[in-house]
Amino acid sequence: MTTPIIWSIAGLDSGGGAGLSADQRAADAMGVHLCPVAAAVTAQNSRAVEAVFPVPAEQLDAQLAALAQDLPPVVVKTGLLGGVAQLRVVTRWVDRLRERGPVALVVDPVLRASTGASFAGDELLQAYRDELLPRATVATPNRREADRLVGEGCPQQQSPLLGVQTVCITGGDAAGPLAQDWLHSPQASGWLALPWRAARNNHGTGCCFATALAAALAKGFVPADAAVLAKMLTTAGLLPDATPGAGAGPVRPAPGFITEAGLLPGLFDTPPARWPARPDGPPAIEGVYGIADSGAQAAELFDAGLTTVQLRLKRAAGESGAAWHTRLAAEVQPARDAARRHGATFIVNDHWRAALALGVDFVHLGQEDLLALDTTARADLAQARARGLRLGISSHSLWELARAVAWAPDYVACGPVWPTLTKAMPWRPQGLDNLAWWAAMSPVPVVGIGGVMVPEQMVRIAASGAAAGCVVRGLKELPVQDWLDAWRSGAGMPATPDPAWPHPSLGGA
């Protein structure tokens, strides 16, 4: 497999903390090839920036021309540019590269050093607004940079920044128990958060974040997934170690960050006040997880030995509310009664308010259901959870897994593991590698779902480390005992090694 190439056009930090030095560390941890292009040279140490010397425009142009002949990029990332002339060299080359094929542009608008030195006057700010940002795929300003670009007190949680489709406004330097970044993208919007880390080595966080995001785009991830990976890498590099100078030391991410479970962020609808607590007690589900399309089938599955069954019903077009609730109640009753007889777990899909009214205490919601919740419904669901309602959530991508984490559910479903005809969806199959990564990284149990047609597939799900495996159509074709035997066989096998990286489940940027 060819290693993706990205260009970073940024400043050279003589202290080795930020700029191209940070970009190189992030690119190495992400497993991409970085071409470091100097747009400015700085005289700085760990405490202060003493001077900035923009590289002459013709020298910057020569660097890019040389690279274009032999090392064309998948993604270009910009940092400190030094001046309007340098910015215009970049825009010209982005346009030339895009004439040859798709090239993403990640703009980290480095306008001020963390020590307070300003890198941009009014003319350069206007060039960002009028010339560079309109070409950007993603922009990653911090809160102060976003304010300078669009005006003080800008509504940062609103979309998008100066026409850029994906914006991630980083805010890890703000006080509070959580480090929160605002994400707006075509795939998802919300607050990416992780517990705040006290670290002296925090010089170059913005550079690392932007480069990691660029690298993730180069590896084929869509922007929302790329932002999740960038959050993970940057947090991993915040270390409490001794610093090489008197000021802040450099962020130092390592390749192993991708399998550190504590680095998976949550994606919250509103700014969170605290990190969500995990559900207490043993796993809510384990083993073979059946999905039935009627209450009678669900009851039969419980009687045949399944300990977890979900009832998946859809409201018919034109069906009135009263008729729907009557039908739902009639379908729920036999399944609920059978579950109680066997001490089993009965789950209702989607219809959480109706399920509660019918005495069901476990519901499953898809991502579209979560997005459809208004402020009142989110509050009501949270209150129901506090009173004991158990919850499972679907996920098909990194950002959906992060959104699920924010709800602290009882389990997360990962799918489709294999291609499925049960319902149309845009997602690529996750495969057993992504399922194993989900199982290793998720703070709650993971269920493998999608395309399970023969017992051997259930064996492989069990061996992946997942807590349970879903089967739908296969329950009508083979006896329940065949599926139970398959689960036991897989659960007794040596665990599948954790994959080094997940693969993208949607097409890239």
Please place each PLM-identified region on the residue numbering.
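Alpha-helix-loop-beta-strand connector modules within alpha/beta enzyme cores
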Residues: 328-350, 377-396, 428-449, 453-454, ...
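Ribokinase/PfkB-type carbohydrate-kinase core domain
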Residues: 45-138, 144-177, 223, 227-236, ...
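Charged C-terminal helix
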Residues: 51-54, 70, 225-283, 481-509
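Glycine-rich beta-to-alpha transition loops that act as phosphate-gripper elements at the mouths
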Residues: 19, 172, 206-207, 291-294, ...
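Short, small-residue alpha-helix embedded
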Residues: 26, 148, 199-223
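Short glycine/threonine-rich catalytic loop with a Thr-x-Gly-x-Asp
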Residues: 13-17, 194-213, 449-450
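Glycine-rich phosphate-binding active-site loops on the catalytic face of alpha/beta enzymes
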Residues: 35-43, 312-315, 366-376, 413-426, ...
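Conserved phosphate/ATP/ADP-binding segment of small-molecule kinases
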Residues: 118-189, 326-407
